[in-house]
Amino acid sequence: MAATRSRAKAREAYDPSFFEKLAAAEDRHFWFRARNRVIGTLAAQLTAGLPAGFRVLEVGCGTGAVLRALERACPRGTVVGMDFFGEGLRHAHRRGSRLVQADLHAPPFAVGFDLVGLFDVVEHLPDDVRVLSDLARLLAPGGALLVTVPAGRELWSWYDEAVRHRRRYEPTELAARLGEAGYAVEYLSPYMSPIFPLVWLRRKLARAGRPPSDAESHALAEGEFRVVPGLNELLDWCLAPEVRRIARRRTLPFGTSIVAVARRR
């Protein structure tokens, strides 16, 4: 009965039927490729001075696409993925990753991690401060949290509702949530800046039209994962230079997403 309730709550936060489309798109789609470059670059920096055997955990690893980027960025460490949904973990298992199926509020780990990643997960959950606070307990002394979230309330649309987002964040809002959860923010910046005008226009037009039904929203959201030849490569090329500024810890002026590095106070 408790397991059934936990799964029902998890489904309120995320629709596991999306995993199939994600698994087919993540390695090629420009958005996921750009996000993985940012995550991989920062993960490599954050673990560069650690002795071999350091531990990295991705919470909400889904199909394992980001795990692969973390494994490439942290070749001297042990990278583990954790997710509640078996539907996503089945895809991650095919990649040969180290995996654990567990609830993020009850992680089965007796050791701390030098880096914990939470990538576009916390916006799905009702109590973001509680989640961030719980994850702080998984960090080894001096360990870092690396987190990404969707940015900008002005970009809210049917897409957010279809994928069960509860919020999009402003940079100051994410910094405040991290502070409430007991972290000191080391770096925080919007990213995906080059595509912001395109996304803003699409969302504005979507809000101006007839609200789609739930079924239409789901189909439209799945369409966001479609890889369009030519356009996909162009947008990937446009986003590629951004990672160099993030590697230098520059703060970008705007974007459709936010990345943050924080450490437990």
Question: What is each model feature region?
Answer:
Residues 1-119, 129-132, 225, 229-230, ...:
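Conserved N-terminal segment of class I S-adenosyl-L-methionine
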Residues 23-24, 145-167, 171-177:
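Short, glycine-/aromatic-enriched active-site segment of Class I SAM-dependent methyltransferases
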Residues 119-122, 148:
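Residues lining the SAM
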Residues 129-144:
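A short glycine-rich, Lys/Arg-flanked "PGG" loop and its adjoining helix->strand segment in the class I
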Residues 183-193:
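Conserved S-adenosyl-L-methionine
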Residues 198-239:
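C-terminal helical/coil "lid" or tail adjacent to the Rossmann-like core of SAM-dependent
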Residues 204-206, 253-265:
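Core SAM-dependent methyltransferase catalytic element
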